[in-house]
Amino acid sequence: MSIRWKSISAALAVAVATLGVAACSNSSDDKNEITVYNAQHESLTKEWVEAFTKETGIKVTLRQGGDTDLGNQLVAEGAASPADVFLTENSPAMALVENAGLFADVDKQTLDQVPAQFRPSTGKWTGIAARSTVFVYNKDKVAADQLPASLLDLAQPQWKGRWGAGVSGADFQAIVAGLLALKGEDATRAWLKGMKDNATAFPNNVATMKAVNSGQPDGGVIYHYYWYRDQANTKESSNNTALHYFKNQDPGAFVSISGGGVLKSSKKQESAQKFLAFIAGKAGQEILRDGDSMEYPVASDTAANPALPPLASLQAPAVDPSKLDAKKVTALMTEAGLL
């Protein structure tokens, strides 16, 4: 029996109207005020901004949007962009802007704060947070010995109609980008075909988790922190579920890197570099750890929230985040009928 796909196409254009105004105005010439195009969680970034401004006196204006929308806007604006800094939840949008030649080199002192596996080899931007791919499952529907050993197993017939994901979102598309980088185009195309046959599309990670919690479907592919945040609060959306971590450098153990970079066109390079250094450094990473985002800090001197399994224990595959190809992922998912 084929799975009925929920309507999700409208989600791709949500931020367009609100972002359009950005291209119509220029940043202030004041060196003590910068503009950040922010696709990272707004609440976390506001905490960073408040602490940074208190420490440095530099004011920060946030323009909020999604990874893909803001990345495409920066490419369209080019050297005329009012943005000084770009922050994302996932790496593909950072790679998009990097490949357009729009990022300045990140200061070496900033890069040195972050281990090499959490930033691109090019040095054009840096990781600022990390999130792990997980399989959330309903404990009443899936026994431990039935859990998939690999993300690739979810394309097999035994998982038909039994799992879902937030297909249209940048989060899931980053996971597919990781699969593409690790296994290549043919394997990714085959897996997406199996997904089309087997899975239910949901608007996002939260909707996926809620559906799994209700038992329809049995499981879903999400990022870890949605589950941990709900567990730390009401547990209403996750009480009937548990997390399964893929191991052994499987594509399902992919760790997505949230990125930050300074625009080459910025006339406020010093202030922009200071902001990036702050959020990637100890002070900014402790704000992330001690807040309610439940994402992983990536600075070498900052441990994760103790509720989370250590990042080093996740057996994530090695993926250079600058190699994640958002355009190819979109093409492959469209070809498979997922977008």
What are these regions (language model features)?
Residues A39-K46, T68-D69, V75, S81-P217, ...:
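Extracytoplasmic ligand-binding site segments that recognize negatively charged/polar headgroups
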Residues D30-V49, R63:
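Extracytoplasmic "Venus flytrap"
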Residues V136-K141, L180, V255-K268, I287:
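A bilobed periplasmic-binding-protein/Venus flytrap-type ligand-binding module shared by bacterial periplasmic
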Residues L19-A23:
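C-terminal motif of bacterial Sec signal peptides marking the signal peptidase cleavage site
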